[in-house]
Structures are given as C-alpha cells and as structure tokens.
C-alpha cells in the first residue's frame, strides 16, 4: 500500500500555511461503503480508490504547511488479487492519486469536507454527464461534483499551474469563477490508463438548467450547429447569445462582484499564458421549474436505482431531489427550499435575477477549459484562421492578452 506521508524534507522552504481551523458545518455519520459497483470497471476502481485515499488521509495529520515537494508528490496502489468479486472490481488494477495533500488543502479552502467528498463520489456510481467543457464527463450521484476525463498532457499542464493556482485560491479566499479542482487521479484497468480530474459542479445539484451558453467573446465560427440545437439541452455559443437577444438580469452590485472576480481570474490566466477558456452560463427558469415539478411526481432518491450498475436514476424535472449523504446531505436537515432558491455554500456559482427582471431566473456562471496554454498548436491555428477570415476578424485563437481583453469586453456586455 502506498504511503501518504509528505515526501518533502524539513529543510524545504515554506510554500503556504494551511488554513486556520474553521467552524465545521453540521455533519452526519455515514455508512461505510463496501460495494463499489458500476457498469464500467474503471468507475468501480475510481470509487474504490477515492474511498481508500480519504480513509488513509484521515489517518494522517493535516500538515502545518505545504512544501514544494507536495506539488510533485503522488501515491500509487497496485492490486493483483484474483479473489476479488469481478462483479464489483476487476482482479488487476492500479489507482494513482496526484498531489494528495495539495488537493486536500484545496478542498478545505473550498469548504468541502473529505467525508462528504468521499460519500458524494463513492456511495454510488457517477452518472454520465454533459455540458461543462470538452471531454467525457461524469456527475456524482448527488450532482454536486463533476468527474472529467482528461489527457496525460492535461495532467502535465495541471502540474505546471498547480502551485500558482493554489496561491491564487489562497489570495482570493476561495472566491473565484475558476473551476474548483478537488482531486486528480489515474486509473489503470487492463493496462489502459484513464486520467480523471474532479471539480465542483458549476450547475446546481437541485435546480435544473433550461438554457446553456459557452461564451468566448468571439463571433467567428461561434454558433451552435443544427445537430447541437436539436439536443435536449443544447450548448449555445456567442452568436446564438446575440441572435437570441439574451441578457443576464442581475443587480448592479452583483454585476460588479461578478466582474471583479472575472477580472482577477482572467489576469491570473494571462499571467500563465492560458487562453481559449469560456464562460459557462446556465439559466434556470424559476416559473418553468415550478411547473415541471408540479407536473412530475415528487422527485427524491429512492432505492430503485438500477441494481446492475449502481446508477442513481436521472431525474428530469424542475428541481432535483437531494441525497441523504455527501456534500448536499445536510440540506435535508434544514427547511425545504422554495422555487428558485439555493444554498450559496453549495451552489457557489449561482446568482438570482434582479427584482424587476422580465422573469425570475437563476444564473450559473463559471470559467471552463482553463488548461489551454498558448503554444505552437495555437500559433498554427491562429495563422490558419487569419488566412481564412482576415487579420481583423474576431477569431478565437489570438494571443493570451488579446484573448483576455476581448473576452472581458464581451462578458461585461452580457448584463442587462
């Protein structure tokens, strides 16, 4: 079994103090997970590995400070056991966790307790998700976390920015529109590697998103295809936003707060020469959500999950049920939320529409696809698009500084 101790020496320079102890939210005892059953063996190993990792981390004291070596560390577990029940886990697999102490620290700064993280990911198999950036996505069964499949190159990119990302999160006290990165893993089943990164869900675990935009601030080749538009929840783009005459109706104070966060985060991305990111905008129509909820049976998590694959049933109604365990678990202990209401400690990317808006809406806004650095591929793409569209066209592949300027200008104009 892998050791979870720090690999840094006592003489290494200090990087950042761990956060001070905060008042913990009400917490519930959670049943130990014994079966890690999913339709995909990779997901079964992922659930097993997260459960094992958190159990091990709980035996290790939280370090007073993070050391430089913590940003390079990893733990690896290799299992060769033919006695495993193959219905639950493959007989040979590897589970590797990157920078466990760093992500543990980030989870704390984002207000996520390890036991809740463990329950959200390991109690029941993640479900196939959709719509928060590129790549294969899964959503935790309680819909609070996104598990995204990434490439080995993106793992390297994440390592390259992790120290600066951590410092940025410390400086802004966790108040950011950037993805909240919570863990990064490699799963090996039958000699095939799968890389996964876990993030907080930018959309609500409870309120259904009715319209969705991916905005880059460019109008060239930025319109949803006909194939995309017929989907149940299409991802619309910049041209669609303009053609639909869409606006975000928030108060002036909310707009200022949003733009302050956005400017701070974009400056951070420019410093790291990162570009091609988007603003993900999800819109919940409160009246429509209320109607859908009335038309449907009362949504809740029952024990009618598919016994073969352990997947929780996907509820397509105005608002989702809440899970008894995990990050959203304590919601059940407080007063029920009304239409369009949310807990800002869970739905951290959410903001209500302003009084007097044409209709009551809830907006979810965050930055996605933030691992693209300006390199030779981007330079080549920029040259090709310049030839095709002309030097003055608003193409998406430009230099990081130009990209940021255009992006901020566009986003500042999405508000009513």
UniProtKB/Swiss-Prot annotation:
Molecular-function annotations in GO: 1-phosphatidylinositol-4-phosphate 5-kinase activity; 1-phosphatidylinositol-5-phosphate 4-kinase activity; ATP binding
Presence of the UniProt keyword Amino-acid biosynthesis in the record: no
PROSITE patterns: PIPK
Pfam families the record matches: PIP5K
Gene Ontology BP annotations: 1-phosphatidyl-1D-myo-inositol 4,5-bisphosphate biosynthetic process; phosphatidylinositol phosphate biosynthetic process
Keyword set, alphabetical order: ATP-binding, Cytoplasm, Endoplasmic reticulum, Kinase, Lipid metabolism, Nucleotide-binding, Transferase
Post-translational note: Phosphorylated, phosphorylation is induced by EGF.
EC number(s) per entry: 2.7.1.149
Reactions mediated catalytically: a 1,2-diacyl-sn-glycero-3-phospho-(1D-myo-inositol-5-phosphate) + ATP = a 1,2-diacyl-sn-glycero-3-phospho-(1D-myo-inositol-4,5-bisphosphate) + ADP + H(+); 1,2-dihexadecanoyl-sn-glycero-3-phospho-(1D-myo-inositol-5-phosphate) + ATP = 1,2-dihexadecanoyl-sn-glycero-3-phospho-(1D-myo-inositol-4,5-bisphosphate) + ADP + H(+); 1,2-dihexadecanoyl-sn-glycero-3-phospho-(1D-myo-inositol-5-phosphate) + GTP = 1,2-dihexadecanoyl-sn-glycero-3-phospho-(1D-myo-inositol-4,5-bisphosphate) + GDP + H(+)
Subcellular location: Endoplasmic reticulum; Cytoplasm
A GO-annotated cellular component: plasma membrane
Stored Gene3D superfamilies: 2-Layer Sandwich, Phosphatidylinositol Phosphate Kinase II Beta
InterPro entries xref list: PInositol-4-P-4/5-kinase_C_sf (IPR027483), PInositol-4-P-4/5-kinase_core (IPR002498), PInositol-4-P-5-kinase_N (IPR027484), PInositol-4/5-P-5/4-kinase (IPR023610)
The UniProt record lists the keyword Transferase: yes
Role of this protein: Phosphatidylinositol 5-phosphate 4-kinase with low enzymatic activity. May be a GTP sensor, has higher GTP-dependent kinase activity than ATP-dependent kinase activity.
Protein known as: Phosphatidylinositol 5-phosphate 4-kinase type-2 gamma
Organism annotation: Danio rerio (Zebrafish)
Gene: pip4k2c
